[in-house]
Amino acid sequence: MRTLIKGGTIVTAEQEYVGDILVDGDVIRAMGTHLDEAADRVIDAKGKYVFPGGVDQHTHFSALCNVGNRDTAGYETTDSAIVGGTTTIVDFAPQDPDRGLLDSIDYRINVRAKDKSCVDFALHSMVTYIMDSIFDEIEEFPRRGISSIKIFMAYNGSPLHVDDGTFFRILEKSRQVGATVFVHAENGEILNFLRSECVKKGQLTPHYHYVSLPPFTEAEAVRRAIYLAGQTDTPLYIAHMTCREAIAELQKAKGTGQRVSGETFTHYLTTTKEVLDNPDFNEAAKFVCSPALRDREDCEALWQALSDGLLTAVSSDHCGIDVAELKQAGRNDFTQIPNGSPGAGDRLHMVWTEGVCTGKLTRQKFVDVIATQPAKINGIYPRKGTLAVGSDADVVIFDPNYEGTVHLADNPNGVDYNLYEGRRQSGRVETVLLRGQVVVENAKFVGRYGQGKFIPANMYASGYENRN
């Protein structure tokens, strides 16, 4: 099947021009101006932007949410992500209670995602049960196509928490095999103390979620993680950065040439902590996430850090937890609200609306942070994350003239709310190709459930490149 996309404004992280793209089978065969090639289908993209398919490097599909042993929304709900212009996710493969790292990865590929995923996917390994065998398993990552591993400095007292000694050992082992370490950087011991103090005082509404997760606990953990990674010369990627204090620590480290970078999320760029003050529990609970939402000055600092290249990706942290049932667990105690919100289907248009349309990001920087850098960071570039001859034909045709409002009904996500319901939306994903197949047309999913496949990642990804 040959498809010719004609006359669109092609935007990559490096350039922008009006041109054509010839897709042949799964890949891009030719790019240029005034291509005159035979094709089975011609798509008129005049007046539209043509982007590489988005790469969302931080999602939690089909993950245990610790309320009644229920999972978050599964891979069958990735249709929302692809309608929103994301063609590849890098999902987390948490270590299951009765499995090692590798068995958990295999189970996710062959059971959880099989015949369900609408998007292609790579995987991060994620340590949740510390045992000596995990260090031997990390040595197998290159043969399994796993280029990254995530650890949690927070959640002391739970299986998720990794102590500093184990963190250091994981850094050393990851460096040996060429893996990048992702870190959730919050001081878990202090957070536990602050949360317990709120409970003792009867401060139980969602407002106190923010109060008990202050910015300094993030900044301190970022500083400590950077220092430990520096001792092993292991590339470090700091997940979900939210505040000025943490950004300052990142900037200092990069100034010394250390191999460290970070991401932020759509909601940290577009929403502030005041939403947690809503007297309607259901509305406030939607926004309970970790780290907590911050203030307007932090939002602006995040936008600036993206523009400057200090932060390299915008992710969604998609976590499909409904309000009507699961978040009710914390109605009388905010510490029991399961953290997380859906967002994979809204990432592109929200970053476009709040970033590009306001002049905070250029179009090329937009492509860089929603597609190119996430692909590079995770070892799947240039197969993913760009428009280039030989790359997978993952293509988004975007209508910049669309003006509307975000509604769950327009792009259902498998749970009972959209985090951005009622917000202004400028621009819309109109058509999406996944490996050459049209899977979104007129902003509606027309693909096949199970069309997505596992994408093995290459080791020694961009974090291992020359020091900054």
Please place each PLM-identified region on the residue numbering:
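Histidine/acidic residue-rich metal-binding segments in metalloenzymes
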Residues: 133-314, 330
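Alpha-helix-loop-beta-strand connector modules within alpha/beta enzyme cores
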Residues: 102-119, 168-183
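Histidine-rich, glycine-flanked metal-binding segment
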Residues: 1-52
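C-terminal cap of metal-dependent C-N hydrolases
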Residues: 328-333, 339, 389-455
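His/Asp/Glu-enriched, well-ordered alpha-helical/loop segment
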Residues: 204-233, 286-287, 308, 312-314, ...
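Divalent metal-coordination and catalytic microenvironments
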Residues: 8, 21, 26, 47, ...
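Short catalytic-loop micro-motif centered on adjacent basic/acidic residues
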Residues: 90-91, 122-125, 235-240
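Metal-associated gating/positioning segment near the N- to mid-region
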Residues: 45-116, 133
